[in-house]
């Protein structure tokens, strides 16, 4: 599939002789607006709070440190603004009111071009079929004459005035409409839907909706209709409750997609906890559970993998899958929606008939640049919260982010310099100093009463650390029953205060007891993974205690590739206003005579084990939402398949001469 064509952005080239002109009272205003739609917000100005709320609605937050926030107006952000009710004049007039300088003409023109076309074309589902509808005759003629759209339609709707689209081609049609500057409106008139049976579901009186969650839902619902789109909230701030509230508002059949079976269990548990939904009205579709709601109407919770699987299924699983395909869903909730652009998962959207989509995520970033595809796969971004603002109000925990540099021992570093890339990576993770620092931090925080999660992408290192330090661990092959048992023990048993997790713990695991996180290895420079892991401790129960902080440690071996990737990983969190403290050394670690791998003999034994590890053991665990991006450092001979080959230059034997007159003895003599 071709890459989506990103709509144009505002540029100065349209009006090359225009200058930025400061208003007379500009000093008191909170924002600067540049030619290209870049907006700088000064958070220390009196009206900065109102300006920030407005900018979140019309622009993409790029960076939000303490004093200065940076936003970018894009075509997609303007589509989202219009989708929640803002008009062209609303956007231009409000932007001008907050701006220190007069709005550049390039920005005015760009806003006008992007917003006037929005809303003229709707995507509607009727009886499990999709239709493009418009009340504008000229727009209808333009759509029906477009070669790409025409090739994916199957005629007019029965009522006329609309084009019928093949279900499998909806994604391509939505993409094409964005390219021609006619983004589709996807709204569901659920109050007037008499075809789908209404669910008996309401929030319990004890369920409390926070102010920012209410803002999210107001962006999604308006005039009795539900808009398709994406809501971005920090980890631990209650994305699941937002989804559950949306379900209880629409009150129609709902399909919830998660990234793991553990997440499925948590969605079901919280649905029953926060609503009055009957237990037999919530079904699970996982490898262990094949359930369907009573009376054929209710909520089904499953994983992306279960729906995307193309192999042969068991009879029971195939039966549930057929029911999912045949059912007309009022709402499709996509948890951790950033995984959807992966080719394996995006086909899920065409498998099920649905009126409305709600995407939930904390990190709207990917390393493969496919995040833009969500604008036509799901819909516009409806709301994105400010992490630091929620932290200041006590909705998520205050965090101390610390990067600890761990010096490599001589033997380990000598091998590190000479080994192939994958084994070098394991050597930097198994660094004895990192082992000792990890042990020290665990002991320190356990003595303070903290609950600790240690993350490792390397399964070899995960097992080695956990077994050496005597802690339970969870990774891919760990059975569902064993996973739930370990997590339950971690939450309730005062003796089990530390657990080790592989990539399977990156997302959708709710552990409000955790107050400290230690990262010993990671997925190269993935910004998303860094933020997702931080989210495991943002929901700490004790977050409102006076002066309480949670701790996020990233252990990095000095003078290795880990230092380069660490700086890349931190960029998303820095853009959210977090700062990292760097510890170049912890003296207490060296003073402990009883720490692990203290002697040279123990370190050499550890090194021997790493060098003898098989190629299979060197692999990192693949997560279910892998982005398909692989980072590696290698040599040209590896790329060309010459790892097992060597170039040797042999000198010709000395003292031998060719016979006179031999053809091989002839020399070339250039003409003078």
Curated annotation (Swiss-Prot):
Q: Name one GO molecular function term.
A: 3'-5' DNA helicase activity
Chain intervals with Basic residues compositional bias: 661-672
Taxonomic lineage:
Eukaryota, Fungi, Fungi incertae sedis, Microsporidia, Unikaryonidae
Query: What role does this protein play?
Result: ATP-dependent 3'-5' DNA helicase/translocase; binds dsDNA rather than ssDNA, unzipping it in a translocase rather than classical helicase activity. Component of the general transcription and DNA repair factor IIH (TFIIH) core complex. When complexed to CDK-activating kinase (CAK), involved in RNA transcription by RNA polymerase II. Also involved in transcription-coupled nucleotide excision repair (NER) of damaged DNA. In NER, TFIIH acts by opening DNA around the lesion to allow the excision of the damaged oligonucleotide and its replacement by a new DNA fragment.
What residue ranges carry the coiled-coil annotation? none
Name which cysteines form disulfide bonds. Answer: none
Q: What is its EC number?
A: 5.6.2.4
Q: Where is the Helicase C-terminal domain?
A: 436-594
A GO cellular component annotation in the UniProt record = nucleotide-excision repair factor 3 complex
Give the catalysed reaction(s), semicolon-separated. Answer: Couples ATP hydrolysis with the unwinding of duplex DNA by translocating in the 3'-5' direction; ATP + H2O = ADP + phosphate + H(+)
Check the record and name the SMART domains matching this protein: DEXDc, HELICc
What keywords are assigned to this protein? ATP-binding, DNA damage, DNA repair, DNA-binding, Helicase, Hydrolase, Isomerase, Nucleotide-binding, Nucleus, Transcription, Transcription regulation
Under the subunit heading, UniProt states:
Component of the 7-subunit TFIIH core complex composed of XPB/SSL2, XPD/RAD3, SSL1, TFB1, TFB2, TFB4 and TFB5, which is active in NER. The core complex associates with the 3-subunit CTD-kinase module TFIIK composed of CCL1, KIN28 and TFB3 to form the 10-subunit holoenzyme (holo-TFIIH) active in transcription.
What does the entry list as the binding residues for ATP? 233-240
List residues of the Helicase ATP-binding domain: 220-382
Compartments it resides in: Nucleus
A Gene Ontology biological process noted in the UniProt record is: transcription initiation at RNA polymerase II promoter
The protein's name in its UniProt record: General transcription and DNA repair factor IIH helicase/translocase subunit XPB
| Source species, domain of life | Eukaryota
Q: Using the UniProt annotation, give all residue ranges assigned to the region (Disordered).
A: 650-672
Instruction: Give the stretches traversing the membrane.
Output: none
Q: Which organism is it from?
A: Encephalitozoon cuniculi (strain GB-M1) (Microsporidian parasite)
- For the motif DEAH box, give the residue ranges: 335-338
The UniProt entry lists the main location of this chain as nucleus
Identify the coding gene.
SSL2
Instruction: Please state which protein family the record places this protein in.
Output: Belongs to the helicase family. RAD25/XPB subfamily.
């Amino acid at each position: 599939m071709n890459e989506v064509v990103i709509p144009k952005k505002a540029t100065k080239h349209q009006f090359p002789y225009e200058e930025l002109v400061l208003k007379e009272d500009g000093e008191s205003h909170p924002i600067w607006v540049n030619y290209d739609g870049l907006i700088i917000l000064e958070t220390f100005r009196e009206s900065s709070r109102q300006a920030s709320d407005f900018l979140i609605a019309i622009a993409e937050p790029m960076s939000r440190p303490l004093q200065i926030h940076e936003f970018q107006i894009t075509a997609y952000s303007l589509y989202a603004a219009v989708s929640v009710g803002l008009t062209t004049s609303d956007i231009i007039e409000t932007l001008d009111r907050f701006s220190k300088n007069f709005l550049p003409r390039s920005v005015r023109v760009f806003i006008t071009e992007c917003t006037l076309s929005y809303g003229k074309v709707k995507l509607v589902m009727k009886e499990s079929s999709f239709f493009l509808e418009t009340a504008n005759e000229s727009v209808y003629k333009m759509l029906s004459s477009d070669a790409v759209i025409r090739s994916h339609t199957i005629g007019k709707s029965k009522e006329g005035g609309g084009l019928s689209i093949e279900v499998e081609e909806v994604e391509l049609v939505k993409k094409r409409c964005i390219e021609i500057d006619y983004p589709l409106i996807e709204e569901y008139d659920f109050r007037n839907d008499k075809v789908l049976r209404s669910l008996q579901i309401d929030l319990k009186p004890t369920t409390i909706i926070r102010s920012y969650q209410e803002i999210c839902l107001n962006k999604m619902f308006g005039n009795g209709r539900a808009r398709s789109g994406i809501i971005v909230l920090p980890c631990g701030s209650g994305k699941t409750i937002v989804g559950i509230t949306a379900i209880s508002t629409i009150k129609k059949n709902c399909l919830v997609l998660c990234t793991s079976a553990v997440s499925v269990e948590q969605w079901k548990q919280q649905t029953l906890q926060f609503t009055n939904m009957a237990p037999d009205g919530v079904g699970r579709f996982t490898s262990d559970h094949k359930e369907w709601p009573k009376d054929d109407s209710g909520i089904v919770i499953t994983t992306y993998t279960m729906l995307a699987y193309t192999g042969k299924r068991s009879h029971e699983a195939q039966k549930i899958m057929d029911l999912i395909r045949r059912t007309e869903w009022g709402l499709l909730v996509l948890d951790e929606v950033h995984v959807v652009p992966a080719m394996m998962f995006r086909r899920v959207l065409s498998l099920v008939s649905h009126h409305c989509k709600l995407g939930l995520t904390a990190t709207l970033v990917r390393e493969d640049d496919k995040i833009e595809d969500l604008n036509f796969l799901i819909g516009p971004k409806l709301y994105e919260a400010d992490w630091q603002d929620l932290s200041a109000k006590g909705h998520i925990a205050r965090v101390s982010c610390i990067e600890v540099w761990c010096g490599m021992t001589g033997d380990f570093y000598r091998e590190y310099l000479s080994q192939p890339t994958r084994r070098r990576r394991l050597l930097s993770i198994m660094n004895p100093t990192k082992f000792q620092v990890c042990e020290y931090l665990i002991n320190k925080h356990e003595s303070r009463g903290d609950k600790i999660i240690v993350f490792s992408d390397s399964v070899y290192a995960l097992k080695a650390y956990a077994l050496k330090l005597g802690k339970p661990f969870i990774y891919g092959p760990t059975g569902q029953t064993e996973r739930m048992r370990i997590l339950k023990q971690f939450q309730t048993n005062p003796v089990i205060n530390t657990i080790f997790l592989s990539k399977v713990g990156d997302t959708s695991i709710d552990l409000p007891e955790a107050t400290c996180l230690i990262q010993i290895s990671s997925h190269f420079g993935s910004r998303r993974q860094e933020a997702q892991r931080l989210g495991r401790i943002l929901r700490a129960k004790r977050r409102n205690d006076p002066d309480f902080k949670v701790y996020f440690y990233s252990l990095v071996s000095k003078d290795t590739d880990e230092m380069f990737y660490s700086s890349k990983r931190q960029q998303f969190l820095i853009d959210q206003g977090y700062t990292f403290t760097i510890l170049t050394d912890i003296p207490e670690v060296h003073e402990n005579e009883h720490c692990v791998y203290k002697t040279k003999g123990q370190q050499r034994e550890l090194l021997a084990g790493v060098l003898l590890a098989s190629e299979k053991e060197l692999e990192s665990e693949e997560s279910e939402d892998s982005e398909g991006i692989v980072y590696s450092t290698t040599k040209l001979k590896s790329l060309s398949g010459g790892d097992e080959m060597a170039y040797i230059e042999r000198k010709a034997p000395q003292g031998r001469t060719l016979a006179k007159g031999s053809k091989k003895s002839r020399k070339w003599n250039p003409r003078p």
